[in-house]
Amino acid sequence: MSGGKGGKAGSAAKASQSRSAKAGLTFPVGRVHRLLRRGNYAQRIGSGAPVYLTAVLEYLAAEILELAGNAARDNKKTRIIPRHLQLAIRNDDELNKLLGNVTIAQGGVLPNIHQNLLPKKSAKTAKASQEL
């Protein structure tokens, strides 16, 4: 068997596998690589950089969608809307820090009432709480 591909004679050629499939990712590694090359971020782009960046983007998207899905379920909805994304991001410390300067259209604000604006406890309820 000199030269040629090893294996059974006459077997069909192995189907090509995308870099996303090789890395076990859903997001497109080839597209991210193309965007890195065309974006003039550097003269040369290594072969591992787009795979790593794609994995990071996929992880962030999955994290945000999971939290937004939980927010939608808490509001008894089956469809994620921008409000659910806003609630998910702003209630998570790390995502809020990462996306602190981002404005989400139709996201609204977090429900928050300042302590001074809440009604004061009456004398009757204050005594009852002290006795307990």
UniProtKB/Swiss-Prot annotation:
The entry lists its GO molecular-function terms as: DNA binding; protein heterodimerization activity; structural constituent of chromatin
Keywords from the UniProt entry: Acetylation, Chromosome, DNA damage, DNA repair, DNA-binding, Isopeptide bond, Methylation, Nucleosome core, Nucleus, Phosphoprotein, Ubl conjugation
Residues joined by cross-link Glycyl lysine isopeptide (Lys-Gly) (interchain with G-Cter in SUMO): K127
Instruction: Provide the record's note on post-translational modification.
Output: Phosphorylated to form H2AS128ph (gamma-H2A) in response to DNA double-strand breaks (DSBs) generated by exogenous genotoxic agents and by stalled replication forks. Phosphorylation is dependent on the DNA damage checkpoint kinases MEC1/ATR and TEL1/ATM, spreads on either side of a detected DSB site and may mark the surrounding chromatin for recruitment of proteins required for DNA damage signaling and repair.
Give the modified residues of type N5-methylglutamine. Answer: Q106
Q: Biological process (GO) annotations?
A: chromatin organization; DNA repair; heterochromatin formation
Q: Please tell me which stretches of this chain the record labels as motif [ST]-Q motif.
A: 129-130
List N6-acetyllysine occurrences by residue. Answer: K5, K8
Q: Where does the record place the site Not ubiquitinated?
A: K120
Positions carrying N6-malonyllysine: K120
Locations listed in the record:
Nucleus; Chromosome
**Segments crossing the lipid bilayer:** none
N-acetylserine occurs at S2
On this chain, the residues bearing N6-succinyllysine are K14, K22
Annotated positions of the Phosphoserine modification: S129
Disulfide feature: none
Alphabetical list of InterPro entries matching this protein? Histone-fold, Histone_H2A, Histone_H2A/H2B/H3, Histone_H2A_C, Histone_H2A_CS
Q: What PROSITE patterns does the annotation carry?
A: HISTONE_H2A
Whom does it interact with, and what assembly results?
Answer: The nucleosome is a histone octamer containing two molecules each of H2A, H2B, H3 and H4 assembled in one H3-H4 heterotetramer and two H2A-H2B heterodimers. The octamer wraps approximately 147 bp of DNA. Interacts with NAP1.
UniProt family annotation: Belongs to the histone H2A family.
Q: Which PANTHER family match?
A: HISTONE H2A
The Swiss-Prot or TrEMBL note on domains reads: The [ST]-Q motif constitutes a recognition sequence for kinases from the PI3/PI4-kinase family.
Q: What does this protein do?
A: Core component of nucleosome which plays a central role in DNA double strand break (DSB) repair. Nucleosomes wrap and compact DNA into chromatin, limiting DNA accessibility to the cellular machineries which require DNA as a template. Histones thereby play a central role in transcription regulation, DNA repair, DNA replication and chromosomal stability. DNA accessibility is regulated via a complex set of post-translational modifications of histones, also called histone code, and nucleosome remodeling.
Q: What's the protein here called?
A: Histone H2A.2
